[in-house]
Regions:
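Positively charged n-region of N-terminal signal peptides that target proteins for export
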Residues: 1-6
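Bacterial N-terminal signal peptides
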Residues: 8-18
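N-terminal accessory beta-strand-rich subdomains and adjacent acidic, glycine-rich linkers
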Residues: 22-196, 202, 565-571, 578-585, ...
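Active-site-proximal substrate-binding groove within the catalytic cores of carbohydrate-active enzymes
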Residues: 166-173, 389-615
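An acidic-aromatic substrate-binding cleft motif
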Residues: 196-237, 241-245, 253-254
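Active-site mouth loops of central-metabolism enzymes
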Residues: 218-229, 322-336, 458-464
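Short, acidic/polar
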Residues: 225-240, 333-346, 468
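Aromatic- and carboxylate-enriched substrate-binding clefts and catalytic-loop regions
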Residues: 249-454
């Protein structure tokens, strides 16, 4: 038993007393992940209550802690292990490296309000779920893993709680969900992500239709060197192509082009770059585009006039970025940020905001508030304060405009973020269409009804039209953002952009809102599929990948996202004629399809449209499962 040594004074004498730390351990027997152990090495004055709450074939475990008075909660863990049988890969919302099942000595990951979510799926190589685990803690830091113990080929997994500084509380509850059902792996992940939001009692904010509109971003091509005239010129071209929104990124608040965030925090527009910001926004509105502006939420730069104003109200100095990180537990900090965004919306006529770097609201070592007994802070818990800040921001902005657009990027994309964000963007991967596709797919599985956006697309203007179309096709299951000098593109590239923008919007209910399935994450998603009542759209991204076209009960589109000029189809129903289109959407003939697996010609970056004939009759099943046409 662990011993604690306590030293205290009595009548001027120093006494030392050795006492026993109070451990806690219990087991929940017979779950789909084997026996689950709940353990705490030192409960101090906390009481644990562990209950099994099974529902719909899924194991749920509720862990409740209570104390007689407010106190920092104790560190505890929920662990399990079972044999590795048909368990080859692990998916997480940040997986991009082949979903490796790592060794137990280096496989702990973590999540909190602004970093991922506590969710992982152990799957085989045939798209089947073996175990999906999740927990209901969406705000505080949680450590978690699924890994392999090399000594005996046992899969070990679980969660660790309160590994980071946490403010005193009197009670705490968390639920663990373990799903071992044999089902398509991405369906299991989507169910678990929805469960986290329900279990944590988090309500997603409104997602206006404009959140699904394609847009133009200034970041990759302009970086900080932005100006009203340049943006208006690009927006004039973008609007004619079909883009509906522009995001003005970093640089509008400073004349400095040296990157970094030393000039953030005052949030006054540069008069040299934008002499009349409100008039500039109006001119873009007249083009038919909405206007969003970037802010780095927590940063007050070393060159900011507000740096002294908030002295003593920072979490730490972020030297790498040349800025200080505000502490949102101070009410005046939250008010300053809310007022800043509301004033910008009112004065400039903004439609939305790109709110960046909220993952920097963290401790860089110890919590500075503890030594000050939380003086001046009306919220003790940092995750709770971040949540309160962003909820206040959304409430204030949506009061001005119920259809306000708010974008966040990976990794701040969990269910708590969806309370105040309606656009979730793949994190930066300039020029990397494969990584963009992976990140879009990961977001589609975990973002509920929020609009999932691609990272901004760019390519070299001397590429072929078919080459220009490839990154677009890799991003078709997210809202497409462009960030390139449109004025420098040849007409053949503009034609490709116009076609695929029109295609993505004509099919947005399927591509962006339909039931989404992602195949073979261990192979970087060679096949993605979205389905609505009217149609099924399949993107193929690996040469030779067999494309299951599914039942011939609706129109099927097959998008050729590889560099070759053919596709391998598995056609289940009879015969059909497929229409063929090239990268710019121009008709390129027809091809006959028959039952079974076949290779058909499809232009590079083109697609097929397979429409059921008018006299097609859906199959009906009788009695013992016999199928009749």
């Amino acid at each position: 038993m662990k011993m604690k040594v306590c030293t205290f004074a009595v009548s001027g004498l120093m006494l030392t007393l050795t006492v026993c730390a109070a451990p806690f351990e219990t087991k929940v027997v017979g779950t789909c992940a084997g026996d689950v152990r709940v353990a705490c090495k030192d409960t101090r004055d906390w009481v644990f209550d562990v209950q099994r709450v099974d529902a719909d074939g899924v194991d749920e475990i509720a862990v409740r802690l209570s104390a007689a008075k407010d106190a920092p909660p104790p560190r505890f863990e929920v662990l399990f292990e079972f044999p590795q049988i048909r368990m080859n890969h692990v998916w997480t919302d940040g997986s991009t490296d082949g979903n490796r099942l790592g060794p137990d000595w280096r496989s702990w990951q973590w999540s909190d309000i602004a970093h991922g979510q506590p969710l992982a799926c152990l799957h085989d190589g045939d798209n089947r779920n073996r175990l999906t685990m999740a927990c209901s803690e969406a705000l505080r830091k949680v450590e978690w893993r699924i890994a392999l113990r090399e000594e005996n080929c046992m899969v070990v997994g679980g969660f660790r709680f309160f590994c980071a500084p946490e403010a005193p509380v009197r009670e705490y509850e968390v639920r663990i969900r373990l799903d071992g059902r044999d089902m398509f792996w991405s369906d299991a992940v989507q169910e678990a992500a929805a469960w986290i939001a329900r279990a944590a009692k988090l309500m997603s904010c409104r997602v206006p239709e404009a959140a699904y509109n394609p847009l133009y971003s200034t970041w990759y091509q302009f970086h900080q060197n932005v100006s009203a005239n340049e943006i208006e010129a690009e927006c004039a071209i973008a609007a004619k192509m079909g883009m509906k929104t522009v995001i003005l990124d970093d640089g509008w608040q400073t004349d400095n082009n040296n990157r970094g965030y030393a000039f953030c925090g005052d949030w006054n527009v540069s008069p040299r770059r934008f002499p009349d910001m409100a008039a500039h926004v109006r001119r873009v509105h007249e083009l038919g585009m909405k206007y969003m502006v970037w802010y780095s939420v927590p940063f007050v730069g070393r060159n900011s006039k507000n740096r002294e104003r908030f002295k003593g109200k920072y979490l730490f100095e972020y030297k790498q970025h040349g800025a200080w990180v505000l502490d949102p537990r101070f009410p005046e900090v939250r008010k300053f940020l809310v007022d800043t965004y509301v004033a910008a919306m009112k004065e400039w006529g903004l439609d939305g905001f790109k709110l960046d770097f909220i993952d920097s609201f963290r401790f860089n070592g110890k919590d500075p508030a503890v030594a000050e007994d939380y003086a001046g802070r009306d919220i003790r818990s940092l995750p709770d304060a971040v949540n309160r800040l962003m909820m206040d921001v959304y409430a204030a902005l949506s009061a001005e405009n119920p259809d306000v657009l708010i974008e966040f990027r990976q990794k701040y994309i969990g269910p708590a973020i969806r309370q105040f964000g309606n656009m979730m963007r793949a994190t930066d991967c300039p020029g990397d269409m494969q990584l963009n596709r992976q990140r879009i797919a990961n977001l589609r599985l975990t973002s509920g009804g929020a609009a999932v956006h691609a990272d901004m697309l760019e390519w070299h203007p001397t590429d072929t039209p078919e080459g220009a179309a490839l990154p677009i096709l890799s991003s078709m299951f997210g809202v497409i953002q462009y960030s390139m000098m449109l004025r420098d593109l040849p007409e053949s590239h503009r034609e490709v952009i116009r076609h695929w923008l029109a295609f993505s919007q004509a099919h947005r209910d399927t591509l962006l809102k339909g039931h989404f399935r992602a195949y073979h994450p261990e192979s970087q998603y060679p096949l993605l599929e979205a389905e609505s009542e009217a149609e099924r759209i399949i993107g193929v991204y690996a040469a030779g990948q067999v494309v299951p076209c599914g039942a011939f009960d609706r129109t099927v589109y097959v998008l050729n996202g590889v560099s070759g000029d053919s596709a391998v189809l598995d056609f289940a129903d009879g015969t059909a004629t497929a229409e063929v289109f090239d990268a710019a959407g121009k008709a390129a003939g027809t091809v006959k399809l028959c039952r079974g697996v076949q290779r058909v010609a499809v232009p590079r970056s083109g697609y097929l449209r397979i429409v059921p004939p008018a006299d097609y009759c859906l199959c009906k099943r009788f009695g013992d499962g016999e199928v009749q046409p």
